[in-house]
Amino acid sequence: MRGFLKVFLRMLILAERLWRRVEAVSRLEEWIRGIFLEAGGSSLKLSQGEGGWITVEADDERLLSSILRLNMRFDPISSMSQPHTAKVVKIGRGRVSYEYPLPDGSTMRKTFHSRDWAVQLGYEGDDFEGFLEALGVVEGMSISTSLNMPSSIQMRIFLDEVLRGLDRIVLIDLTPQEVEEILESGFKGFTAFYETLTPLTHIVYLKLGSSLDKASKRLEALIHSIAPGASYRPLSWRRFSKIDWSEARFEI
């Protein structure tokens, strides 16, 4: 039939899913659709697939993949090859359990010992879980793994966190536009800059001299107003101050 154009949508499984905030799905679709249409795409649909992983159908899969990768530190697209962008699902008894999706939508479940990662990073103390928590390895957060160890990009992020010497706050279940809204609503004064790891996880670096406690209280109020149900975790840099960090320890 003339004048009829059928649009074929191709599906991408993102290495991203909600932690606790259901409303983040619709907000994430708004953000992805906005940047996709701006780049020349025309049709996009977002949903949750098996295991809760975010599924995106778009008329230009390559364009969408490129846009998402350009906006994230971790590769947000599921893949069979290493490294894998994963979600931390449980921490306890010296172990960290995490999950990531495969391109067919199935879920891989794996576990590593906190000690293995901590030692790899040069930590010589006894509180392995506390050390990893200070680096942002917390339940609900995204990590990047290769052969059950930190990937090269994950090592780079860990090193950046230490060398910058700034307190941080990790954000979970917030979209990039919601992070921007929080900054513009009264949090910019605390913020040096922030990084988006995946579509729903971010690291905010506080300005030198900013109070982590005051920043956390202000952030809590803003999240309650702008994105109820989203999570955050304040991370103090002081926990690193007595550790002998050397770039030689990081094989990047």
Where are these regions (language model features)?
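Generic marker of residues within folded, mature protein domains
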Residues: P76-S78, L135
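Beta-strand/loop nucleic-acid-binding surfaces
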Residues: P103-L135
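DNA polymerase sliding clamps and clamp-related checkpoint/processivity subunits
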Residues: R69-P76, P83
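Structural detector for short beta-strands of small beta-barrel domains
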Residues: S78-G94, I143-L147
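Short aromatic-glycine-enriched beta-strand elements
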Residues: G94-Y100
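OB-fold/S1-family RNA-binding modules
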Residues: M1-N71, G92, D126-I252
